[in-house]
Amino acid sequence: MSLKPFTYPFPETRFLHAGPNVYKFKIRYGNSIRGEEIEDKEVIVQELEDSIRAVLANMDSLQPFVTEHFIVFPYKSKWERVSHLKFKHGESILTPYPFVFTLYIEMKWFAEDLPSGKPADDIPLELVLAETEAEEATMRKWKRKLMEEPSSPSRQGPHRAKMETSSEASSNKKPLKESKRSTDEEAQQEYQDTPASNAIAVKEQDAALGHGLQGLVVPPLQHSSPPPPKEPGARGFLGFLSALFPFRYFFKKSGQ
């Protein structure tokens, strides 16, 4: 299988056939790839060809691997609408492989600068992916737990306590209103009873003042008696006559 030159460091898609099959490869380069870092382009072409052969030899169990200059992360995904495609090589019809191979390529020093500080040859590259996947799974589990906690029975205690507290607060408000109403009634009753109590208090205060001021002589008040009502003149004259000569005497004489 002879390959055409690659477009390194630019991404590309290649259709390669081996025997009666056609394979689709996507080559993608990471941010660590710089075209001027490797002057010998033939070395790059050889390493990329060897990477493709390694993927085809282990297509059922893909694992990251290392070349002289690169780290290759191979992935496999479903080839969409592959049934609508037809491939021919000369007169022979080729069968497309139903999966697409994607190669993510980084420079080798990218693994040497990992936080672990260990050399790339001693670190299985799949460990980096496994750690990333584990972190993502942990985050998903944590978010799911946060979403499920409010609806779980164990989390209903504070809500119930909050509801009970609010109900107690509302029940406490009712006696306050009743006590306020009773206080208003008592104040009104006290206001109605105030004149009698004030009169008693005034009498007691006067008695106290009289007891305390015994040395003082208070002149008695002079009450002027009102004149007797004047009767009309006719009534006074008739009364005078009736006093002298009773009418019964005149009526008695006339009857005889």
UniProtKB/Swiss-Prot annotation:
Disruption phenotype: Mice develop normally, exhibit no overt phenotype, but are infertile (both males and females). Gonads are characterized by the absence of post-meiotic cells. Impaired localization of Terb1 and Terb2 to the nucleus inner membrane. Residues 175-184 have a biased composition (Basic and acidic residues). The keyword Membrane applies. It is found in: Nucleus inner membrane; Chromosome, Telomere. It holds the Pfam family MAJIN. It comes from the Eukaryota. The chain crosses the membrane at residues 233-251. Residues 143-197, 211-235 are annotated as: Disordered. GO terms for biological process: double-strand break repair involved in meiotic recombination; homologous chromosome pairing at meiosis; meiotic attachment of telomere to nuclear envelope; meiotic telomere clustering; oogenesis; spermatogenesis. GO terms for cellular component: chromosome, telomeric region; nuclear envelope; nuclear inner membrane; nuclear membrane. Keywords: Chromosome, DNA-binding, Meiosis, Membrane, Nucleus, Telomere, Transmembrane, Transmembrane helix. Its main location: nucleus. MAJIN was named after the 'genie in Aladdin's lamp' in Japanese. Belongs to the MAJIN family. This is Membrane-anchored junction protein. It comes from Mus musculus.
